[in-house]
Regions:
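Proteolytic maturation boundary segments
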Residues: 1-89
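M16 family metallopeptidases and their MPP-like homologs
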Residues: 1-3, 70-103, 107-159, 169-179, ...
Length: 184
């Protein structure tokens, strides 16, 4: 026989009307307003290392290298000098956590969960990073999802999201790691 408190719980539950779970899916596009494209200001080919360099109208320098490793994958890395080395002592810990916070917060109007739903079945990802000397973004995409990758890159720089719930979740994980570190 079940203990009395479990029997009461089952009796209470049997009287409740419980609605089925309805998944909330955002139907808006990732990037609602496509920005005006820039132009290529200059191009140069380096035959000795088989790369092409373009300087864009916004000053960004792009170096392209084709390989025969994987025909269905485009990998990128974007960076600028700086990293932890330019942080004040007071901001160092915050700076070290910044990339993780950005990664957990989603992009534009999309939480990280909404973004995962949008990206289901697609091959596109971006990850911000900060190390000792550089900060930047890395990622990859299939050729079919290249436009989506460019939208994600654009949003990383123009519409990074501040998500208090994601921040609280990440802080809980960090606290747990610190508490468990003393046990090992």
């Amino acid at each position: 026989a079940l203990p009395i408190y479990l029997t009461k719980v089952f009796e209470k539950i049997s009287t409740l009307t419980i609605d089925s779970y309805v998944d909330k899916v955002i139907t808006e596009p990732l990037l609602p307003n496509i920005p005006t494209p820039g132009t290529v200001a200059s191009e140069k080919h380096y035959a000795d290392i088989d790369t092409d360099e373009m300087v864009l109208s916004n000053g960004v320098r792009v170096v392209l290298k084709s390989t025969d490793f994987k025909n269905d994958e485009i990998i990128f890395k974007a960076f600028s000098p700086g990293g932890f080395s330019v942080f004040s002592d007071e901001d160092l810990m915050t700076g070290k956590m910044a990339a993780n916070i950005m990664d957990y917060s989603g992009l534009g109007n999309f939480s990280v969960i909404d973004l995962q739903k949008l990206l289901a079945g697609k091959q596109a990802s971006t990850t911000p990073y900060i190390n000792s000397l550089y900060e930047g973004l890395r990622g990859s995409a299939s050729p079919n999802d290249l436009e989506l990758l460019f939208q994600m890159i654009h949003l990383q720089f123009t519409a990074s999201r501040q998500d208090a719930e994601a921040f609280a979740s990440l802080m809980t994980q960090f606290r747990s790691q610190l508490e468990n570190k003393s046990l090992s």
